[in-house]
């Protein structure tokens, strides 16, 4: 499914359909702000954790039947991060986003919700039992996916805060961190996208760029650069094998625990990301959305992961920090803290990292709250936003539910299993949406010459009905008897 999504969006970007404009008028946001909001909507703050520590998991339990803890396992650890956070994942987001944006901005269908688009494609009533079930599944899956980001972020943040200030690393401090972040994104949600989320996303985007840039400058620059180039080469060379690796001669644990989990995690987020991308992409062309999401977001992820993981690997192979051992004995949060503290002016780097993390968490939860409020709003039209009170309600909900899960002490594996189970129905839903999208494109643009596509707006069924003349009663047509 992920490979099919990638193939389809690349075809759309390079064909005449790429020039279809999603709504009338000029884009509402600058390209940079637009890309930053993509990143905040599509990535959780736990990205900052995985961006430092994920390679160590792959080093200990690698894919492709590579020997654990070998030189080859170390060499493939960064490429696997690039693979899981790269083009395939963002292509899935892109496809779902294009379908929703076309439904809302081109076809002018009402309702920025999953049930709304399913209703437009299949004819089921969005307020009927099937429509309500679809929206309920979306809300449950979104909370489940968000929980992993929030719990991992809280644990990483409090471990780093403890190293900086001496505060205890316990549930009370973790709860305070979550509530603090909740307060920030509640305020941002109340202010609105233009003055709230847009500003937070800019702070996150610049912070997530400047932090690894400084690490690249003050760290082992040559090693990091060579590591990134090598990882890009290995990812490109082995992309198809990584995508289709099922481990038929082994137990399949790597594929199941990592690749399948990641694909389903991304898929569980697709409805929410699609709603948010639709909201901020009015006036953009289809190919702009495709290249912005696939290339812009992938390059951003690869730069952060490439620099931070390569620095951690350098510290490991030079005997400064045994990151895999720390990961096993003290946990990934401690491994992240020790890697950052090993930098020159390590405390400043750790403080900056934690600052970016808390703002990242707030901006991501703000975007999620917006999509959940949009799902709960009937007949939302182009240019409208969900009610502020409804947005605040969902802000509170997505703060308290993960907080309760954190209190129970659920393991990461348990949360990953929950994500997999709740995401499975969205595979079917995504296939239904893809079928409807292809049908719409054929109906609306198949006969339109390529040079006219950009300025052509198809007539919606509602517009066609409004333009149908209403004849007086008793009108007799020629040939009637």
Swiss-Prot record:
It comes from the Bacteria. The keyword Mitochondrion does not apply. One of its GO terms (molecular function) is transmembrane transporter activity. Coiled coil: none annotated. The chain crosses the membrane at residues 32-52, 82-102, 137-157, 173-193, 204-224, 258-278, 289-309, 348-368, 392-412, 418-438. Disruption phenotype: Deletion of yeaV has no effect on the aerobic growth with D-malate as the sole carbon source. GO terms for cellular component: plasma membrane. It is found in: Cell inner membrane. Keywords: Cell inner membrane, Cell membrane, Membrane, Transmembrane, Transmembrane helix, Transport. NCBIfam families: bcct, PRK09950.1. This is Uncharacterized transporter YeaV. The gene is yeaV.
């Amino acid at each position: 499914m992920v490979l099919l999504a990638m193939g389809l969006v690349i075809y759309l970007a390079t064909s005449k359909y790429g020039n279809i404009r999603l709504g009338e008028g000029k884009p509402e946001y600058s390209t940079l702000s637009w890309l930053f909001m993509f990143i905040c909507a599509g990535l959780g703050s736990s990205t900052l954790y995985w961006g430092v520590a994920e390679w160590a998991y792959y080093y200990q339990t690698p894919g492709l039947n590579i020997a654990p803890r070998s030189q080859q396992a170390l060499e493939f650890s960064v490429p696997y991060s690039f693979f899981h956070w790269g083009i395939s994942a963002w292509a899935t987001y892109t496809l779902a986003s294009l379908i929703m944006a076309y439904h809302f901005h081109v076809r002018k269908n009402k309702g920025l919700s999953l049930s709304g688009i399913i209703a437009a494609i299949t004819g089921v009533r969005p307020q009927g039992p099937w429509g309500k079930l679809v929206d309920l599944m979306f809300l449950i899956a979104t909370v489940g996916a968000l929980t992993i980001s929030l719990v991992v972020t809280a644990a990483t943040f409090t471990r780093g805060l403890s190293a900086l200030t001496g505060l205890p690393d316990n549930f009370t401090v973790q709860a305070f961190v979550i509530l603090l972040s909740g307060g920030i994104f509640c305020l941002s949600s109340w202010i609105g996208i233009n003055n709230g989320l847009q500003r937070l996303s800019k702070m996150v985007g610049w912070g997530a760029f400047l932090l690894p840039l400084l690490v690249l400058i003050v760290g082992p620059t040559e090693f990091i650069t060579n590591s990134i180039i090598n990882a890009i080469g290995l990812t490109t060379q082995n992309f198809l094998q990584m995508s289709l690796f099922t481990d038929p001669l082994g137990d399949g644990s790597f594929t199941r625990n990592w690749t399948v989990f990641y694909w389903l995690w991304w898929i569980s987020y697709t409805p929410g990301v699609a709603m948010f991308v639709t909201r901020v992409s009015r006036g953009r062309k289809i190919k702009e959305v495709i290249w912005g999401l696939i290339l812009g977001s992938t390059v951003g992820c690869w730069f952060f992961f490439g620099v931070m993981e390569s620095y951690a690997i350098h510290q490991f192979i030079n005997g400064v920090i045994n990151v895999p051992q720390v990961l096993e004995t003290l946990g990934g949060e401690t491994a992240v803290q020790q890697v950052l503290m090993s930098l020159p002016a390590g405390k400043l780097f750790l403080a900056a990292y934690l600052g970016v993390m808390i703002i990242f968490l707030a901006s991501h939860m703000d975007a999620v709250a917006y999509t959940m409020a949009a799902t709960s709003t009937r007949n939302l039209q182009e240019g409208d936003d969900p009610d502020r009170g409804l947005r605040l309600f969902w802000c509170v909900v997505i703060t308290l539910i993960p907080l309760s899960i954190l209190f129970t002490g659920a393991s990461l594996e348990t949360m990953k299993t929950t994500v997999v189970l709740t995401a499975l129905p969205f595979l079917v839903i995504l296939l239904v949406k893809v079928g409807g999208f292809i049908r719409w494109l054929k109906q609306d643009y198949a006969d339109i010459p390529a040079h006219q596509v950009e300025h052509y707006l198809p007539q919606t069924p509602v517009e066609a009905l409004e333009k149908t003349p209403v004849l007086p009663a008793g009108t007799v047509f020629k040939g009637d008897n």
